[in-house]
Amino acid sequence: MSQIQETERFDLQYTVTASYFVPSFNKDGHMIEEEKKNQNIAFWRLQRRNIEHSKLSMSILSREESEQKGVIGLAMDFIKACCVNDKVREDLLGDALACVEIFQSEPVSEDFRRFFGTWEFLKALPKNPSGKK
């Protein structure tokens, strides 16, 4: 008799509430920054079958690449790969600090923890990579 292993099922999207700035014009026609406050922004959950999600995650795990890109670069890569709405994605990419705030938010951190938890090879890594006790 074979056993069927149930896989975890979850929605493919989640939301993060964040504020960000977009370019706009005032009544005199001068360019200003307009704040979009407390927007519920939809993001794709990180998925094993999405190559961009896997590349992004490997970038985060790679010390060299993480240092090279920095938090802003990784945050912007996350927005490019995971923001559901094209217009919102474009707006967010114009506000790097909003990208960082979203990238460091609890819902995003939780999704990365869940995603990394599906990587069997990470579970096999020693707790102390240096080998020292």
Protein language model regions, located:
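Extended acidic low-complexity intrinsically disordered regions
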Residues: 1-16
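Short, surface-exposed, charged amphipathic helix/loop patches that serve as local interaction elements
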Residues: 2, 21-24, 28-133
